[in-house]
Amino acid sequence: MRQYELMIILDPSQDERTVAPSLDKFLEVVRKDKGDVVKVDVWGKRRLAYPINKKEEGIYAVIDLKCESATVLELDRVLNLNDGVLRTKVLRLDK
C-alpha cells in the first residue's frame, strides 16, 4: 500500500457542520477496499486564488490515506462525479 495526500475543495454553500459526514461518505470507498484513512484535516472556508465554477470561496479539506492505486483512482472518480466538489488533487507521498 502507498501513502497519498488528497486535497478537496468543496462548494462553500454547504454548511460547515455537514462537511465531515459528506467526507465520510466519500471515504467509504477507501475503507471498503481495505485502505486506511490516516488523518482528515478540514481547514474550513477559504478564499480561492481564482474563481472555480463562479465561486470565490471554497471549503478546504486535506486527507492522508494509505491504500492501493486503484482505490485512489476510484475515489477520485467518485469525487469528480459529485456536484458539491469543486476541485480535487491527489499526491503520492514519498516513503
Curated annotation (Swiss-Prot):
Gene3D superfamilies: 3.30.70.60. One of its GO terms (molecular function) is small ribosomal subunit rRNA binding. CDD domains: bS6. The keyword Translocase does not apply. One of its GO terms (cellular component) is ribosome. It comes from the Bacteria. InterPro entries: Ribosomal_bS6, Ribosomal_bS6_CS, Ribosomal_bS6_sf, Ribosomal_S6_plastid/chlpt, Transl_elong_EF1B/ribsomal_bS6. GO terms for biological process: translation. Keywords: Ribonucleoprotein, Ribosomal protein, RNA-binding, rRNA-binding. Binds together with bS18 to 16S ribosomal RNA. PANTHER family: MITOCHONDRIAL 28S RIBOSOMAL PROTEIN S6 (PTHR21011), SMALL RIBOSOMAL SUBUNIT PROTEIN BS6M (PTHR21011:SF1). Belongs to the bacterial ribosomal protein bS6 family. This is Small ribosomal subunit protein bS6. It comes from Corynebacterium efficiens (strain DSM 44549 / YS-314 / AJ 12310 / JCM 11189 / NBRC 100395).
